[in-house]
């Protein structure tokens, strides 16, 4: 997701919280909410479903729980979770039981789907705004039809062949265990 483009193009204030630090997020939400209330604005929390480099999961369930105390929208970039996490492969939100509480869901077809392109799942109004206002989309073309058909077929396989995802996890665990056994430090990945 082109975060830098998003940050440069918006007129609001940006608050950053440390990686997966929920107390840090809470403090920033207090600051952001106070400012948003004063300026009649809104708050958008951006995180990842699976953090690509360390491989740990975003604490989406804990972030969603904060919606009881703060008013904000949640954008999840789940490039590494879509197709691999959750019962149906819908992503990390599904895996953690909060997929329906994610306001803006972004993922790519380039990772688990072995294709090109990406998608945003959200309200129609937001999609229309992004489509016609994001610099990266103004002169963009639609995906080539063979790539669309390929993505649709892979989505169908995700739904109808759960054994493929199970095999992926079997191979993943074998690789992780083999690397650890041979002295490689692969961190504390849970993906």
Regions found by a protein language model. Give the residues of each.
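Short, small-residue-biased leader/transition segments that mark boundaries at the very start
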Residues: 2-6
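Short, structured coil segments at secondary-structure junctions
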Residues: 9-11, 101
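Helix C-cap/helix->beta junction micro-motif
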Residues: 10, 69-70, 182
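Active-site phosphate-binding strand-loop segment of PLP-dependent enzymes
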Residues: 15, 19-76
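Short beta-strand
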Residues: 17, 43, 106, 140-141, ...
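Conserved PLP-dependent catalytic core of the aminotransferase class-I/II
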Residues: 58, 145, 152-191
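Conserved core segment of the aminotransferase class I/II
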Residues: 104-106, 113-162
């Amino acid at each position: 997701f082109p975060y830098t483009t998003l940050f440069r193009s918006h007129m609001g204030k940006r608050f950053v919280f440390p990686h997966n630090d929920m107390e840090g997020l809470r403090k920033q939400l207090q600051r952001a909410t106070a400012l948003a209330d004063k300026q009649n604005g809104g708050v958008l929390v951006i995180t990842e479903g699976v953090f690509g480099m360390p491989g740990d999961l975003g604490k989406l369930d804990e972030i969603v729980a904060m919606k009881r105390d703060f008013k904000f929208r949640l954008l999840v970039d789940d490039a590494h979770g879509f197709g691999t996490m959750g019962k149906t492969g819908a992503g990390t939100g599904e895996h953690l039981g909060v997929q329906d509480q994610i306001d803006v869901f972004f993922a790519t077809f380039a990772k688990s789907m072995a294709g090109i392109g990406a998608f945003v799942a959200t309200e129609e109004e937001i999609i229309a705004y992004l489509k016609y206002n994001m610099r990266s989309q103004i002169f963009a073309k639609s995906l080539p039809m063979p790539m669309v058909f390929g993505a649709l077929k892979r989505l169908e396989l995700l739904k109808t062949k759960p054994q493929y995802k199970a095999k992926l996890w079997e191979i993943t665990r074998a690789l992780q265990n083999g690397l650890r056994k041979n002295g490689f430090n692969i961190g504390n990945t849970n993906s």
